[in-house]
UniProtKB/Swiss-Prot annotation:
PANTHER family hit by this protein: TATA-BOX BINDING PROTEIN (PTHR10126)
Sequence repeat feature ranges: 8-84, 99-177
UniProt-listed GO biological process terms: DNA-templated transcription initiation
TM region positions: none
Keywords per UniProt: DNA-binding, Repeat, Transcription, Transcription regulation
UniProt similarity note: Belongs to the TBP family.
Gene for this chain: tbp1
Role summary: General factor that plays a role in the activation of archaeal genes transcribed by RNA polymerase. Binds specifically to the TATA box promoter element which lies close to the position of transcription initiation.
MF-aspect GO terms: DNA binding; DNA-binding transcription factor activity
Pfam families in the cross-refs: TBP
InterPro entries: TBP (IPR000814), TBP_archaea (IPR033711), TBP_CS (IPR030491), TBP_dom_sf (IPR012295)
Protein name: TATA-box-binding protein 1
């Protein structure tokens, strides 16, 4: 990966921490928790170390977003479970945490000709309408991700389930552009 530097920007993961939650109890006990079921069916709770946000639902399901790596997801979910336990809410031990989406950025460190890339990659896999969006949208089947390619050489990878998916997708793009003589 020497030609590109990959940085994870956001990890979204989900888990089930209990059979059900009383969100009004959590809102009253957790400082900064926000719950307004007329606006949104879940409780929003933010933490700062490591930085993350939770969507907590009455079903016992929790969505965690905002961390920069998968290890931090496990840390903050564990901390949330401990905090719930501390206010008398029993949680599932060792909950299964599923990464739903990883967004990463990368830089190929070169200016790219998006018109040539659009033709070279084939119109069936890309969307490129520069009047509407300055990037080229490239859908890759393996790993199944979407890569936004910008003329600056910057890439945004969305849809990865692991950091390795993001790294592989950047390598796929780099190799394809290189093989077309566009790097």
């Amino acid at each position: 990966m020497s030609e590109s530097s990959i940085k994870i920007e956001n990890v979204v993961a989900s888990t089930k921490l209990a059979e059900e939650f009383d969100l009004t109890v959590i809102e009253s006990e957790f400082e900064g928790a926000e719950y307004n079921k007329q606006k949104f069916p879940g409780l929003v709770y933010r933490v700062s170390d490591p930085k993350a946000a939770f969507l907590v639902f009455t079903s016992g399901k929790v969505v965690c977003t905002g961390t920069k790596n998968v290890a931090d997801v496990h840390t903050v979910v564990g901390n949330l479970a401990k905090k719930l336990n501390s206010i008398g809410i029993k949680t599932i031990e060792n909950p299964q945490i599923t990464v739903q989406n990883i967004v990463a950025s990368a830089d190929l460190h070169t200016i790219l000709n998006l018109n040539a890339i659009a033709i070279g990659l084939g119109l069936e896999n890309i969307e490129y309408e520069p009047e509407q969006f300055p990037g080229l949208v490239y859908r890759i089947d393996e790993p199944k991700v979407v890569v936004l390619i910008f003329s600056s050489g910057k890439l945004v990878v969305a849809g990865g389930k692991s950091p390795e998916d993001c790294e592989r997708s950047v390598e796929v793009v780099r190799q394809q552009l290189d093989s077309m003589g566009l790097l």
